[in-house]
Each structure stands twice: as C-alpha cells, then as structure tokens.
From Swiss-Prot:
Key words, A-Z: Chloroplast, mRNA processing, Plastid, RNA-binding, tRNA processing
Record-linked InterPro entries: Domain_X (IPR024937), Maturase_MatK (IPR002866), Maturase_MatK_N (IPR024942)
Protein's UniProt name: Maturase K
GO MF: RNA binding
Keyword Phosphoprotein appears in the UniProt entry: no
Entry GO terms, CC: chloroplast
Pfam family membership, one: Intron_maturas2
Cellular compartments annotated: Plastid, Chloroplast
Functional note: Usually encoded in the trnK tRNA gene intron. Probably assists in splicing its own and other chloroplast group II introns.
Family of this protein: Belongs to the intron maturase 2 family. MatK subfamily.
UniProt keyword RNA-binding present: yes
Amino acid sequence: MEEFQVYLELNRSRRHDFLYPLIFREYIYALAHDHGLNKSMIFLENQGYGNKFSSLIVKRLIIRMDQQNHLIISANDXNQNPFFGHNNNLYSQMISAGFAVIVEIPFSLRLVSYSQGEEVAKSHNLQSIHSIFPFLEDKFSHLNYVLDVLIPHPIHLEILVQALRYWVKDASSLHLLRFSLYEYCNLKSFITPKKSISIFNPRLFLFLYNSHVCEYESIFLFLRNQSSHLRSTSSGVFLERIYFYGKIEYLVEVFYNDFQNNLWLFKDPFIHFIRYQGKAILASKDTSLLMNKWKYYFVDLWQYYFYMWSQSGRVRINQLSKYSLDFLGYLSSVRLNPSVVRSQMLENSFIIDNAMKKLDTRIPIISLIGSLSKAKFCNTLGHPISKPTWADSSDSDIIDRFVRICRNLSHYHSGSSKKKSLYRIKYILRLSCVKTLARKHKSTVRAFLKRLGSEFLEEFFTEEEHVFSLIFPKVFFTSRKLYRGRIWYLDIICINALVNHE
C-alpha cells in the first residue's frame, strides 16, 4: 500500500473524484505488472501477455489513448482495429490490468489511513480467510446441518458497475468500466469464462465480484446480528460500504415488513457463516426446519432484492453425519467415533458405549486424478504416464517442475485426516517424472532407476517433513505420530488452482 502513497499526486480530499487520469500514468501499469508476477501457478507456467510488458509498449499505449477523441476497442476485429492495430489483445489486457489497480485505490487508501491511526468510520472488524481452519477444528464437529450455497452471478453486467458507485464517484472511470464489460464479455462468458475473459484482467473481475457480494452479505449479516447477539464467523473478503449505515433505518423498516413473521425462527446462537470465492456455507446446530427457512430466505433475498436469478437447487441442506461437504478442496464431514468403556463397581461391571463426533477431512481423490489427467500426468484411471511436452527440457528442469507440483499438493492437503489418497497422488507424480526422464533418454523405467539409484526420489520429500525433523525431537519424528494429525498452513490460500479442481 505504500506504493500508492508514493506515486499518487492527487488531493487527499478529492481522490475518489479523479481516478480516470491515472489510466494515463505509466507507473499504474508497472504496479499491475508486479501484481501479475505474484500469481501462484500449479500445473503450468504463466505464458500470458504479462511477460511481454515493457515501458516502450506502455508509452505507446498512453500516447495512442491520449491522441484519440474516443477510445475505440473492438475484441472482434483484432487485426483491423485502427486504434490498437495488431496488438489489440495485448493493449486490451494492459488497460484492464491497469484499471484493476485503479479501482482498488480507494479501498487501499482507506486501509492505509487505518494503519496510520485514523479511525475507519463504523467498519466491521470481520475475520480473515484464515479463521476457516480453527472453525473446522473447533466448531465444525459440534454442528448438525450445513447449507451448501452456490452464490449466483448477476443477471446483468450493469449491476457490477452500480456496485462500484459506492466506491468510485468518477463518472469517467465508471463509463470506461461499463464500456469494457460490454465489449469483452456477455452473460454467458462471464459465468463460464473462456477466451473472451483471458484478455480481461482476472484481478478486476475478482474485485467487482467481491464488491457485489458485499452488497447482499452486509444485509445478511445485519439481519443475522439482529436475530442473535453472537457474531457470525465470516471468512470472505469484505469491502466497506460507505453509505450502508445511513440506510440501516430504512433496512430495518423493510425487513420488519417482509420478514417479521419469520425472524423468530432465526434466533440460533450456533449459526456460522463462511464464504470463500463462489461458495458459502451456513452451519447450525439446530433442526432441519430452521435450515429450510434460511434456504428460502437466501433465494428470496437474491431474486427480489438484488435481481439475481437463483433456484432452490443452488442451496443444498446436508446433514454432516451422512454427507460430505465439498469446500476449500476438501471433503469434510462429521463422523461418529465409537468407544467402549468398562466400568468396575465392586462386584458389578458395566460396559458403556460412547460415541464422540470427530471432524473428518478427506482428499477428493477422483477430482484430483481428473486434474492430473487433464494435465497429462496420468490417464483417466490414475495410471502414470510420461509428460512428452516437457521431454525437451533439461533433467534438472523436469525434476524441479515435478517436485514443485508434488510439494504444493502435499502442502495444501496436509490438513487431510487420511493420508493414503495423498500418497497415491505423490506416487503418480513420481512415476510420471521417471517416465518422462526415461522417454527423454530413450530408456526403460527399470533401467533408468537402476542407473540413478534410490537417491533420485529424495527430491520428492516434502518441505514440511524436513522442517519437522529440525524442530521436533527425534522421538516424535521417528514415531510418525505427528503426520497422522491435520496440519493447516496459512499460506495455502495462495494455491488457488487446488480449490477448484474442475
């Protein structure tokens, strides 16, 4: 956030009104390029336009934008466009990347002022995404039902632009955003992003999505807090609404008229709400009747107040003791762990059967094998195959790629309660690496391993195993009891590709 303070030369009292001129500043594109370098890729390297950014191209783009009376961009005419010429896709992505940095400035400056001791007016101190892990460990096993919610997309792109009006008061910036959205995507491509979205910056879409979700989440949390004095556990990225608290009085009147008869069913102190990306869960210890009320409340709120098409099938009610919840790349459920205790009292003995609830987190092995199959590491049955596209690289480069993928998978899924599936994935990657090297050297797998020896596979030892061997005593390290438990790493949220296997 210091980078914004260094470069911005805008009046502090009018920063929100003059964001559009920043699109003509070279440092904005440099910041956008730095953001692009921080992405974490799992299976493939970044081969997009981001590695072609240069100061000469940026200057050429700014000069052309400054000389034109109208910003004419056409994604359907990449070769004949008089404005961008043959570099239409590159320039288009540069503009969207720069604009993604610009629209984040008001929110970033608000965080900077808060870190400097200035009070942020009436903002919620909501918990971060990392609060999901203690929630799963401490609270999840005590709950009975969960609502598995797929958050719907807006039915019209204008809704995304309207959501930013609370943030950006610069009409020119909003017009540029509206023009770009209508030019490069329609409703179908926005819901299932394909090639048309590849030239539009994903960071910008993530910002627009979060700002839109905050609209109805703020109302939901307000109603949730009115029905219970306990705060809900929220793990999404929320953006403060400037004028929300000025409308609370109106919202109370609206919900009083429309939901008065149902509010008494919502008074549940054990409700927990968590959102991550396009999914949300609402977990409760109460009955299925309460969860049905919440289900239809969500659907009505989306359809009648935010004009988003939603069906009741997008909100599923699952009983945790019978179904698994697919969330954050894990299949989580609550299973009963039976135990038998013999109690001796004088001459009489009693056998007491006791069942304790225990959190069970499993790896979705089928979807992971499907992802490895798409990346050509194995076939659809999970049998390892060679990676022919990497056979032209050096041996060290091939090994480094496989080791990086194996460590990322092991690092992310270290929170699994059953490690057998993880060992199978690591076996697929190890054998695929050996087959790729054997293919390169025109040898068999058996002969290649015999020549290199068993030390060859030591590269696949995960990073955490080396760390634990240094930190913990040898008695714990050799007993291997440490690895049977769940270990949550706070940096796994950076491995975005593992959350959505499909």
